[in-house]
A protein has these predicted regions:
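Conserved ABC ATPase "signature" region
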Residues: 16-33, 273-288
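Conserved ABC ATPase signature
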Residues: 37-41, 292-296, 300
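Hydrophobic anchor residue at the start of the ABC signature
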Residues: 51, 306-307
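Catalytic Walker B motif of ABC-type/P-loop ATPase nucleotide-binding domains
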Residues: 62-65, 317-320
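ABC ATPase C-loop
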Residues: 55, 309-310
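Conserved ABC transporter NBD signature motif
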Residues: 226-240
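Helix-to-loop junction immediately C-terminal to a conserved catalytic motif
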Residues: 218
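H-loop/switch region of ABC-family ATPase nucleotide-binding domains
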Residues: 97-98, 352-353
Length: 375
């Protein structure tokens, strides 16, 4: 119904609507989701549905704003394939992105915007032949595919990690954890440890249960079985909520104050005055302190919520896709901040599909697949 909504408003023939919807679903690899309720889908799956809706509209121009955000590598490949098909069909395709690697060989022109104006323009070939030093000086994300999750931690540490999800002296841990939505099992028998002083990244395909796992860990969702412990002792949902700071995937749902400075004090009353100003400065937000949080860009909202999580000084900090909508400079800033939080003794848990980010910060990587976990 969602894919056909636009065409229905234009009174198109039902047979045409069915054909357009089926074609868009096939292009985006969501045919198996067509009978699912939107409320049951993961953030990445919803992103693919939104793109399929745009494809099914039949419009001659497609504007895609951060289409790769929240998507796993396979889903990004689906997006690339769909954009290529539209290009071959003669449509005008405009993509606004920070994650640039998947558009290599596809983009015909690349425009760099700064301060509301076009600063530079390249042909696709010239842009993707840019040297690494030049790329970084322009504040651009990597132009090279960061590879599969298994390569992320290896590329940072120069060696493979231990093939185990368990460690000694874990700050947060789960044993035989199970979670179901009605008769749908998300995961079962899951064992994992999250040590203090380290950054643990959780990867996996869209719909594998990553967001569900962190919601269960921090006490926002009730697992159907198993035990979750803090510092080696079983902890109730209330205890976990008090110990965890969570940055959700949809940051707009975590903004409540009428100023950025006020946002910091909601969970940390001492984040005022110079302390609050310094925290905003650390995230390049000091010049926006009097702005209403909901007036910020997506990347600015992301950084504000991370700053608010840091202000709480809680022993467990959980972030769900913290680098969506973030450029290279701010990605480096978030990486450095998470490293400081971990060095101060917190267990940092990050759900991410962003290989560039994970390769820069992850000490450990846990890869989820439906109904199982591997390290």
């Amino acid at each position: 119904e969602e894919l056909a909504f636009c065409g229905e408003n234009y009174g198109r023939d039902r047979a045409v609507l069915r054909e357009q919807s089926d074609r868009a679903a096939a292009l985006m690899g969501i045919t198996h989701l067509m009978d699912r309720k939107l409320s049951s889908l993961s953030g990445g799956q919803l992103q693919k549905v939104a793109l399929a809706c745009a494809l099914a509209s039949g419009a001659p121009v497609l504007l895609a704003d951060e289409p790769a955000s929240n998507l796993d590598p396979a889903a990004i490949a689906d997006v690339r394939r769909a954009l290529g098909v539209l290009k071959e069909q003669g449509l005008t395709v405009v993509v606004v992105e920070h994650r640039l690697h998947f558009l290599r060989g596809l983009a015909d022109r690349v425009l760099l915007m700064e301060g509301g104006a076009v600063k530079r323009c390249w042909s696709g070939e010239d842009f993707y032949s840019m040297g690494e030093e030049k790329r970084r000086s322009l504040g651009l994300r990597t132009l090279v595919d960061p590879g599969a999750p298994e390569a992320w931690v290896t590329s940072r540490r120069g060696e493979a990690g231990e093939d185990s999800t368990r460690v000694e002296d874990a700050r947060l841990s789960c044993r035989n954890l199970c979670f179901s939505y009605g008769d749908k099992t998300v995961f079962e028998g899951l064992d994992a440890d999250f040590p203090a002083g380290q950054i643990t990244c959780i990867a996996g395909v869209n719909g594998a249960g990553k967001t569900t796992l962190v919601r269960a860990l921090c006490g926002l969702a009730a697992p159907s079985g198993g035990t979750i412990s803090l510092d080696g002792r079983p902890a109730s949902r209330r205890q976990r909520r008090a110990a965890c700071a969570l940055v959700m995937q949809d940051t707009g749902r975590q903004l409540f104050s009428d100023t950025l400075a006020g946002e910091l004090t909601i969970g940390a009353s001492d984040a005022t005055g110079e302390a609050g100003e310094q925290l905003l400065a650390d995230f390049d937000l000091a010049h926006l302190g009097d702005r209403h949080p909901l007036s910020l860009s997506g990347g600015q909202k992301q950084r504000l919520v991370i700053a608010a999580a840091r202000a709480t000084r809680r022993p467990v900090v959980i972030l769900d896709e913290p680098t969506s909508g973030v450029d290279a400079r701010h990605l480096d800033s978030i990486t450095a901040t998470l490293r400081r939080i971990a060095d101060e003794g917190a267990a940092v848990i990050v759900v991410t599909h962003d290989g560039e980010f994970a390769a820069a910060c992850a000490d450990r990587l846990i890869t989820l697949t439906p109904h199982s976990v591997a390290h």
